[in-house]
Amino acid sequence: MEKNIAVIWGDCSSPEIVKQTLRVLDKVAEKYGHTFHYTAAAMGGEAIDKYGDPLPQHELDKCLAADSVLLGAVGGPKWEGLPGEQRPEKGLLRLRAGMGLYANNRPAKIWPQLAPASPLKPEIVAQGIDFIIVRELIGGVYFGQHQTHTLENGEKQAVDTMPYAEHEIERIGRIGFETARKRRKKLCCVDKANVLDTSRLWRAVMHRLQAEYPDVEYSEMFVDNCAMQIVKNPAQFDVIVTENMFGDILSDEASMITGSIGMIPSSSLGDGTRGLYEPIHGSAPDIAGKDIVNPTACILSAAMMLRYSFGMAAEADAIENAVSRVLDKGLRTADNMSEGCTCLGCTAMGDAILAELS
């Protein structure tokens, strides 16, 4: 099979993890008889430095022409003083909107080998942590109207709106139900329906969808309670579906209970098969150039790309199993190092995963 992949190398330490990920993809292509073509696309700080824009149209066009997009991470201290529209993160928002990616799927799973690294009590971890947060990605408060104005008394007031239309809720809700149907058949819709009209509309739409999925156990939970339950009893969750801002916050919380943010991939999908795949961690500017950043989340993101966009389940399994065997051997990067294990740098971890793939 032949596929075209747009590669956003990213900022700070990001190119280091992307380099190792492409090595893994090349090994998969060699082993399974595929051909992957890579096209570099600039976004974030790199694009700001080159073009004065976090995502110029010609760079977005490269992503739209590809079968899928692999991203490292963008941003860093160098660009923090820029106005909002010129910041690296704005490029990511525009990329998601331009590609029509409305569903972010982020797994929260503890690898058994890394269970001691979880900040949760061992008895909670022992119950199992394996759920997915399906987050609506291009609606809500991040894409609503934003304004700051001056009141009559001279003080400033800022207003951000959280708009959602029924079709936006229905399409993400359907992905939530379909995802649950393929897993343990439990879906929890997280909202703030006791306060927000948008949340009440979410519930109304989800109730209509529920009738189409009688095999899925459906429940609802307020976002504040969900934030507590994720650390108190994470084993109760299978799939969580929620709006943009709630999902942003909850998925970051969920990432921390797994023991290492450097192990968590993510996918962003729309109506077709083309998606955006990226690790959930940032660009780690403090360790850039030191060859110590953990490439595993980016490599696992590539595995998600093979599975969800290219239909290459066996190839994705091969990568994930290779990572598991590396962990079985006690090989770690600095972020998830524990007593009795061997600490590897970024390139060495890439080498170890490649060796397990061979």
Predicted regions and their residues:
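Extreme N-terminal starter segment of soluble prokaryotic enzymes
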Residues: 1-5
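N-terminal glycine-rich phosphate/adenylate-binding segment common to multiple enzyme folds
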Residues: 49-159, 245
